[in-house]
Amino acid sequence: MSTEENKAIVRRYREAHTSNNLALLDDIVAPDIVSHSGIPGFPPGREGGKMVHQMFLSAFSDGVSTTDDLIAEGDEVVERFTFRGTNNGSFMGAPPTGKKVTTTGISIFRIAGGKIVEHWGENDALGTMQQLGLIPMPGQG
């Protein structure tokens, strides 16, 4: 596949998450996708990824991710994204705070046969927890 076709797959991935239409993932994510940044306690593969999304949706029901950059080379696509949402449900064991968060992250996707088969992801988890008031900002004790 061309790099433009691979980028289109990642755009559909983001669309599936932003529109909460996770059925779209069945067409573009391999059932046995390897996630190098999975969250402990969730099963591996595509179904585990859907469960992680549902956890975020229940914590940030108005959450929206936007793609800021897409860079592709060979069978890999790098996405820089921004997530915005209001914490109106429990998140990682903490009760809802009602606070709005804006956080950024980077994902790397490897694509084979028209499907995402591997994923690496990093996001500003510390900044998110600070915005939620769950971890103090430096100098605030």
Predicted regions and their residues:
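C-terminal and inter-domain tail/linker signature
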Residues: 1-141
